[in-house]
């Protein structure tokens, strides 16, 4: 019987589950939208909402709790400075799950989890801005070689 077992196990050990949660939380905070399987998205949603609620409280204790859960100072700073300000008028429901069909290889149900009222430009954090003139000079170098 499954009495009193509220948490999803996701067929992983407890340490693997904690690492998965931390990595997915950091990715969601950094990019504000990630694509994953539906069970993982359902596992992540309440935890992400709790992190935002924790970031809205302005105490040293909550900052330390954020650092212990995320273990990434840039993610913790983004929660405290950006996301908490964006959702200060909202009481919960900071994320949404959108079903995104099925994965090709194993037919697993996929989903997109994202922040409500997200910043569309946040997905472009790591992409380098390419200069078209520089690309043409590189093509010329390759053509002459």
From Swiss-Prot:
Matching entries from Pfam families are given as:
Ribosomal_L17 (PF01196)
Judging by the UniProt lineage, the source's domain of life is Bacteria
- GO molecular function annotation: structural constituent of ribosome
- What are the GO cellular component annotations? cytosolic large ribosomal subunit
Query: Subunit info?
Result: Part of the 50S ribosomal subunit. Contacts protein L32.
Per the record, the similarity remark reads: Belongs to the bacterial ribosomal protein bL17 family.
Protein name listed in UniProt: Large ribosomal subunit protein bL17
Organism annotation? Pelagibacter ubique (strain HTCC1062)
Upper classification of the source organism reads: Bacteria, Pseudomonadati, Pseudomonadota, Alphaproteobacteria, Candidatus Pelagibacterales
- Name the gene: rplQ
């Amino acid at each position: 019987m499954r009495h009193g077992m509220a948490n999803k196990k996701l067929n992983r050990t407890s340490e693997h589950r904690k690492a998965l949660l931390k990595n997915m939380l950091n990715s969601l905070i950094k990019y504000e939208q990630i694509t994953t399987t539906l069970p993982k998205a359902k596992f992540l949603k309440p935890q992400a909402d709790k992190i935002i609620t924790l970031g809205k409280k302005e105490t040293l204790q909550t900052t330390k709790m954020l650092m212990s859960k995320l273990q990434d100072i840039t993610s913790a700073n983004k929660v405290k400075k950006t996301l908490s300000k964006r959702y200060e008028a909202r009481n919960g429901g900071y994320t949404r799950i959108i079903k995104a069909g099925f994965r090709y290889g194993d037919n697993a149900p996929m989903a997109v989890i994202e922040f409500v009222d997200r910043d569309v430009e946040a997905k472009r954090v790591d992409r380098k801005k390419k200069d078209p003139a520089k690309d043409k000079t590189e093509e010329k170098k390759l053509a002459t070689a």
